[in-house]
């Protein structure tokens, strides 16, 4: 179990917090598990509403364009056949559901593996708050988060009730904000650093699923 410092908006050290080993230090990081869960998550985000009209769905074309024989041309039954301009589309996309079935235990294990990777590279941070006081300030939030991490993309985890932090950081283009219950594998991996407020960290740790057999499978990163 490793220990990290808790930083205050003023830049001072406000104490330390322990990162539970069952969440932030699993024995082996499974790359195939992370890949499978991220692919499933991105697939589930697809709308799948793409649609084209086939020849039977395109308006018009009910009349035979010319007689069957005697013209010297190939026989045609409708101007909405796919070989005509304005005709239907053959083998085009239809609405579908791209979501994949992913067991809850697999999602939870993948999140622990992603957090372990960030923790081992010193990219997990805990702060007392995003700003000092209750008055929202995007300028103050940007300055403080820039001191916490110099990397580009930051995942900020705050409590739902922390309105001052939300209003202060939501307009920062490189900061993505989530609540503890929304934390997921993709957002952890796509961000350079994960920054928890102290309240959000305690909430996440108390409600996070514990390690299981899935954490012992896969290759070590």
Swiss-Prot record:
One of its GO terms (cellular component) is ribonucleoprotein complex. The keyword Transmembrane helix does not apply. Residues 61-72 have a biased composition (Basic residues). Keywords: Ribonucleoprotein, Ribosomal protein, RNA-binding, rRNA-binding. InterPro entries: Ribosomal_uL4 (IPR002136), Ribosomal_uL4-like (IPR013005), Ribosomal_uL4_dom_sf (IPR023574). One of its GO terms (biological process) is translation. Residues 44-102 are annotated as: Disordered. It holds the Pfam family Ribosomal_L4. One of its GO terms (molecular function) is rRNA binding. PANTHER family: 50S RIBOSOMAL PROTEIN L4, LARGE RIBOSOMAL SUBUNIT PROTEIN UL4M. Part of the 50S ribosomal subunit. Belongs to the universal ribosomal protein uL4 family. One of the primary rRNA binding proteins, this protein initially binds near the 5'-end of the 23S rRNA. It is important during the early stages of 50S assembly. It makes multiple contacts with different domains of the 23S rRNA in the assembled 50S subunit and ribosome. This is Large ribosomal subunit protein uL4. The gene is rplD.
């Amino acid at each position: 179990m490793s220990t990290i410092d808790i930083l205050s908006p003023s830049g001072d050290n406000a104490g330390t917090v322990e990162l539970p080993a069952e969440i932030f230090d699993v024995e082996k990081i499974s790359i195939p598990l992370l890949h499978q869960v991220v692919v499933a998550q991105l697939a589930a985000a697809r709308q799948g509403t793409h649609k084209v009209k086939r020849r039977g769905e395109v308006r018009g074309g009910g009349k035979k364009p010319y007689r069957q024989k005697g013209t010297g041309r190939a026989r045609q039954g409708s101007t909405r056949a796919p070989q005509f301009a304005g005709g239907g589309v053959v083998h085009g996309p239809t609405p579908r559901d791209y979501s994949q079935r992913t067991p809850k235990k697999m999602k939870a294990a993948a999140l622990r593996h992603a957090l372990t990777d960030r923790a081992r590279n010193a990219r997990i941070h805990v702060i007392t708050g995003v700003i000092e006081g209750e008055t929202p300030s995007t300028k103050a939030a940007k300055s403080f988060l820039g001191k916490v991490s110099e990397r580009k993309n930051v995942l900020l985890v705050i409590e739902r009730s922390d309105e001052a932090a939300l209003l202060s950081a939501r307009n920062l283009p490189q900061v993505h904000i989530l609540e503890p219950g929304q934390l997921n594998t993709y957002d952890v991996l796509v961000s350079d650093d994960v920054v928890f407020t102290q309240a959000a960290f305690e909430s996440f740790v108390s409600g996070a699923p514990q390690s299981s057999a899935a954490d012992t499978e896969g290759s070590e990163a």
